[in-house]
């Protein structure tokens, strides 16, 4: 798995080997970001069900001003991915916030966001789909 565009293009992202994490493929994220290319620069991004942080980090690579990643389990992979992207962008630190919390709950992340990515695990989508969509 890698960053598909922007300054950090090609940077490998770590993915947990346990816990059933199956992040969106590079191909899917690239298609999403190609569709949104004109809208990403200068935005504040919220990445719900962040897992590896791929959507938030990809957004920063493509010019977003800040990204907030929310997941019930913020692990070392997300932290390592943020550090790798920051290094590739020549930054000591990214404008990046990690929140450990339930992404289905309103108000889990404070502030105003221009783009929101919500890519929940399939099982969660089946049990809480209506709640997530609200």
Residue ranges and their predicted role:
Residues 1-134:
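Class I S-adenosyl-L-methionine-dependent methyltransferase catalytic core
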